[in-house]
Each structure stands twice: as C-alpha cells, then as structure tokens.
Curated annotation (Swiss-Prot):
It comes from Cervus elaphus (Red deer). The modification Phosphotyrosine is found at residues 24, 199. There is a cross-link at residue 49 (Glycyl lysine isopeptide (Lys-Gly) (interchain with G-Cter in SUMO1)). Expressed strongly in velvet antler reserve mesenchyme. The gene is ANXA2. It may cross-link plasma membrane phospholipids with actin and the cytoskeleton and be involved with exocytosis. This is Annexin A2. Keywords: Acetylation, Annexin, Basement membrane, Calcium, Calcium/phospholipid-binding, Extracellular matrix, Isopeptide bond, Phosphoprotein, Repeat, Secreted, Ubl conjugation. Annexin repeats lie at residues 33-104, 105-176, 189-261, 265-336. GO terms for cellular component: basement membrane; cytoplasm; endosome; extracellular region; nucleus; plasma membrane; vesicle membrane. The modification N-acetylserine is found at residue 2.
Length: 339
C-alpha cells in the first residue's frame, strides 16, 4: 500500500512535470491578445506627459512572458526603438525593476540576476543561492546557455571566481543542472543507503564529509531525496535541517538549508522567502520583486496557498501593507488575487 509520503511525492511530481507550468501560475496568456495594439498603447503611455504608468502596468502584468516578447517585437517594429530602453527612460525605482524584469525571458531574467549577484566587489550570496538551489535541470541548462550568450563567459567560470571552498563546490555542482530526473521506480535500498551515508558523513562522525553531502544532494532526484530526508530521521536524532545547522556554517550552511527546503517543498520555500522579505522594518524589495516576477507563471498559486496556511494572512494582504503606488499595483497583479 502506498504511504502518504509516496502519494505526496507523486502529487509533487505531477505538479512539476505532468501539468504545464501555467496551471499553477497566476499570470496566464491574455485571450484577446493583439501585440500591435498593446505596443501602440504602451507607446502612447510612454509619450503621455508624466508617463501613464497605469496603462503600462495593466498591459505588461496581464500578458504571458511569450506575449510580452511579441509586444517588444511589435514595439521595435513600430518605433525603431527597443521597448526595454524606452521603459527604462520612462520609469524609475522599484516599478522600473519589475517591468524590465517582466520583459526578459525567464532564462534571461535569471541570468541577469545571477550576473548582478556576482558583479563588482563582494558577492550577493543570498541571490546566488536562491536561484541556483531552486531551478530545475531544464531551467539551469537554459540559464547556462543564455548566460554565455549574454555575457560571453560561462556561468560556472563566474561562480568559481566569485566563491570559494565547499560553498563553491556545491554551487558549481548544482549549476550544472545534472540532477537525476524523477523516475517511476522507487529504489528503497538506495534511499536507505543515502540516508545512512548522510548521517555517517555528518552528525555521526566528528568532522563532516561535505563532498559526500554534496554528491548525494546534487545528483539524486528531488523525489528520491524527499524520501531520503524522511528515512534520515530513523538514523539521526536530528532532521536534515537541524543536522545542517550543527555541522556547517556560513554560506555553506545557508546554501544547504535553502537546497533542502527547496527539495522538501518549493512553494513553501518561496512563501518563507517572501514573508522574510516583508517582515519587520523595511522591505527587501530585490527578493520580493525577483520571486514575484520569476514565479508568476510557474507556481504562484501554490506559493499563495502555502503562504496563507503558514502565516494566517494572504500574500496579497502583505504586499498591500508593505508597498505602495503603481509598484504595489504591479506586484498585486502578479500575485493574481487575494486568498
């Protein structure tokens, strides 16, 4: 008989593969889409005295990414100017960041966020970790391709020159996007072996065998690892997250924690990140914007559901409390509704 865990795993698999990503996205393709009309309306909005931001927001947050690419193409054909450049001049602040993010393809957006996280002095490890830990094989392979196209260098090369030690090894292994895909066969022997190996390499021994942790957590499929982390609890007095906190520190600890949370429940991981970006004084807008833009066509509905379940109030409510103006309007459209 199937255990509850197997059923949940199967459901999460189906959520990730069998249904088109848009099924859980808050932004859908616009039905009566007309790229020429949208391009004309955006052109008029940009030329309006003081810029008609409302029209720009209304159009671009209510079109799918593919449709936005068509609008950009139509706009360039009309005006001989790039839509992104025109909007960069017309808008400012956080709203500009959201709108320019929406104009990029998902891989271009991730590639540019990764580049920004490693540019100049110091690395924004937080952004690097979030993107590298949460993207699928397919997404990572596409990011690698686009990154090289955009920056004439390999993503791996930039990660290597910007990070060090075991943290570098973990990031490089993940960035390759070579994790095993979820299969239909469940290998209980390997699940048990991996759970024991993770325990033997960490909590059980005096020092941590980090390469062993890295190889298991970056090579095995997501569904397999969900079962491994369950099984792990029968060997270790601590669960995987507690073990990580005991065994490693700094960026490596942060990366392993993010990775395990993504594997266990990705929508919940993003719900937590969104909550953290808005709690307390001041908003971490960079994180808020990146998640709202990058997940709007992937799993925003699941994220909203996890958010409400855990924090008692809706994501929509939190965004309303924490942001204002047309920036708020854009984020609320991407959120797709109140719960």
């Amino acid at each position: 008989m199937s255990t509850v865990h197997e059923i949940l795993c199967k459901l999460s698999l189906e959520g990730d593969h069998s249904t088109p990503p848009s099924a859980y996205g808050s932004v859908k393709a616009y039905t009566n889409f007309d790229a020429e009309r949208d391009a004309l309306n955006i052109e008029t909005a940009i030329k309006t005295k003081g810029v008609d931001e409302v029209t720009i927001v209304n159009i671009l947050t209510n079109r799918s990414n593919e449709q936005r690419q068509d609008i950009a193409f139509a706009y360039q054909r009309r005006t001989k100017k790039e839509l992104a450049s025109a909007l960069k001049s017309a808008l400012s602040g956080h709203l500009e960041t959201v709108i320019l993010g929406l104009l990029k393809t998902p891989a271009q957006y991730d590639a540019s966020e990764l580049k920004a996280s490693m540019k100049g002095l110091g690395t924004d490890e937080d952004s690097l970790i979030e993107i590298i830990c949460s993207r699928t094989n397919q997404e990572l392979q596409e990011i690698n391709r686009v990154y090289k196209e955009m920056y004439k260098t390999d993503l791996e090369k930039d990660i290597v020159s910007d990070t060090s030690g075991d943290f570098r090894k973990l990031m490089v292994a993940l960035a390759k996007g070579r994790r095993a895909e979820d299969g239909s066969v469940i290998d209980y022997e390997l699940i048990d072996q991996d759970a024991r190996d993770l325990y033997d390499a960490g909590v059980k021994x005096k020092x941590t065998d980090v390469p062993k942790w890295i190889s298991i957590m970056t090579e095995r499929s997501v569904c397999h690892l969900q079962k491994v982390f369950e099984r792990y609890k029968s060997y270790s007095p601590y669960d995987m997250l507690e073990s990580i906190k005991k065994e490693v520190k700094g960026d490596l600890e942060n990366a392993f924690l993010n990775l395990v949370q993504c594997i266990q429940n990705k929508p919940l991981y993003f719900a937590d990140r969104l909550y953290d970006s808005m709690k307390g004084k001041g908003t971490r807008d960079k994180v808020l914007i990146r998640i709202m833009v990058s997940r709007s066509e992937v799993d925003m509905l699941k994220i909203r559901s996890e958010f409400k379940k855990k924090y008692g109030k809706s994501l929509y409510y939190y965004i309303q409390q924490d942001t204002k103006g047309d920036y708020q309007k854009a984020l609320l459209y991407l959120c797709g509704g109140d719960d």
